[in-house]
Amino acid sequence: MTTVPTTQRAVVVGPEDGSVVVAESIPLPDIEPDAVLVQVSAVALNPVDTKMMPGFLNPGNVLGLDFAGTVVAVGPAQPAWRSLQVGDRVFGCTDGCDSRRPRVGAFTQFTACRGSILIKMPDHMSFATAASMGNAIFSSGFALFHSLQLPGSLTATAEKSHWVLIYGGATATGTMALQFLRRAGHKPIAVCSAKHFDMAREYGAVAAFDYHSESHVQEIRDLTKNALSFAFDCVTTQSSVLACEEAMGRLGGRYTALDPFDPTLVSRKAVKLDWILTLTLMGRGSVWPKPFGCEPDEALLTWGTKLAEVAEGVLAEGDHVLKAHPMRIMEGGLDAIPSGIDAIRQGQVRGFKLVYLL
């Protein structure tokens, strides 16, 4: 049985703007009634980890979303269907990165998380693979089946198959979204660099287009016969927003982004706009600065809980039912994470995800 210490090492927001440091001794997070304490075995980096600086978090706040590990303590108010026990291997996103709960984050030796939004790992899955999948699963499910309101699901094929544009098809969320769409019976189109075409097709794209090409929008319109009505933008730059709008068919449709964007960029009233903040699936809302701030929403927690339950069942079907994004397992544990965050900021991480074993 694991002995749980009272303090731990963690990667935290540093005292200077934009800095990330390793704290040698901070208290463990409290375990709320519906939460579990997890001994972290692996973590993965996401672009959002580069943004959690003053204004979002305060100096000393723990960083990190994606993790995998082993349950070492369980709160008394777990939902009946979840029934997590000490010793269970789990993964997911922390419901941390929140100045209201400064000791909760993934980049620690022990983290706390609501049990209902954790996913039990199948026996065949490694901690490294599991750590790389949490944010991608929740972001893809949230965008495709909640925001875009696509028919079908991970376990049910839609009666009508739709073209769906994934802008950023070679990102970690993009490759997961491609797989979700194929399972739901849709026809995903990836936009990425030409060097990642094979990867996009391997993850489920029926076609791939190079965003460097001036003709890629027209090529998408030609392929879809001017009938594209769904777009998920995993990049969210001015050029990606405009490209997604222009690729939409004459009747318009729905556009969802991973980040906030300027809605005045889109002139077509027939295109319904949205963006998602995946952490709201944890039910706590957000105290990040505008436009991220929002009130707690129990309905989103219920939806996120159901997604975790469904994803857990799908992963239990066998190895490679849902494939993780290509990853690089890095040496150095927590001490190496600050340099990994710098690498993402400098644009050195493309087409793969950085994973650290602890």
Swiss-Prot record:
What EC number(s) has UniProt assigned to this enzyme?
Answer: 1.-.-.-
Question: Quick one: which pathway?
Answer: Secondary metabolite biosynthesis
Q: Which domain of life is it from?
A: Eukaryota
Task: Answer whether the UniProt record assigns the keyword Oxidoreductase to this protein.
Answer: yes
State a single Gene Ontology molecular function. Answer: nucleotide binding
Q: What InterPro entries does the annotation carry?
A: ADH-like_C, ADH-like_N, GroES-like_sf, NAD(P)-bd_dom_sf, PKS_ER, Trans-enoyl_RdTase-like
Q: What class of enzyme is it?
A: oxidoreductase
What job does this protein perform?
Trans-enoyl reductase; part of the gene cluster that mediates the biosynthesis of cordypyrones A and B, 2 pyrones that show modest activities against pathogenic bacteria including methicillin-resistant Staphylococcus aureus (MRSA), Mycobacterium tuberculosis and Bacillus cereus. The HR-PKS milA catalyzes the formation of cordypyrones A via condensation of one acetate with 10 malonate units. Since milA lacks an enoyl reductase domain, the 2 beta-keto processing domains DH and KR of milA collaborate with the trans-enoyl reductase milB to catalyze the different levels of reduction.
Q: What subunit structure does UniProt give?
A: Monomer.
Annotated protein name in UniProt: Trans-enoyl reductase milB
User: Lineage of the source organism?
Assistant: Eukaryota, Fungi, Dikarya, Ascomycota, Pezizomycotina
